[in-house]
From Swiss-Prot:
UniProt GO molecular function: growth factor activity; hormone activity
Gene source species: Agrotis ipsilon (Black cutworm moth)
Positions where Arginine amide occurs in the chain: R63
Taxonomic lineage: Eukaryota, Metazoa, Ecdysozoa, Arthropoda, Hexapoda
Superkingdom of this protein's organism: Eukaryota
Protein name: Insulin-related peptide 2
Ranges in coiled-coil conformation: none
């Protein structure tokens, strides 16, 4: 168990170092592994309140139908951008 925690911390440090270097391309297996690493332990969005569908659509804006592949494989992205997909 301790091995997995240490391994996760090492990977997190590696991700932090790569984010300091700027942006990178993440595609395929590398994208899924990096997302899993970045999102590991991240808190899920609050589901404690409910918004009617009409109001939710009005609040949407933002990303539209773009996903992590559009953001990180077709153009470079940072770890901070990847965190928005957790």
């Amino acid at each position: 168990m301790k091995f997995y925690i240490v391994f996760a911390l090492i990977l997190a440090c590696a991700a932090c170092v790569s984010s300091q270097e700027g942006t990178n391309f993440y595609c395929g297996r590398q994208l899924s592994r990096t997302l899993a690493l970045v999102c590991w332990g991240a808190e899920k969005r609050d589901a404690g309140w409910w918004v009617p569908p009409q109001s939710a659509r009005a609040l949407g804006g933002g990303r539209g139908k773009r996903g992590p592949v559009d953001e990180c494989c077709l153009k470079p992205c940072s770890i901070e951008e990847m965190l928005t997909y957790c």
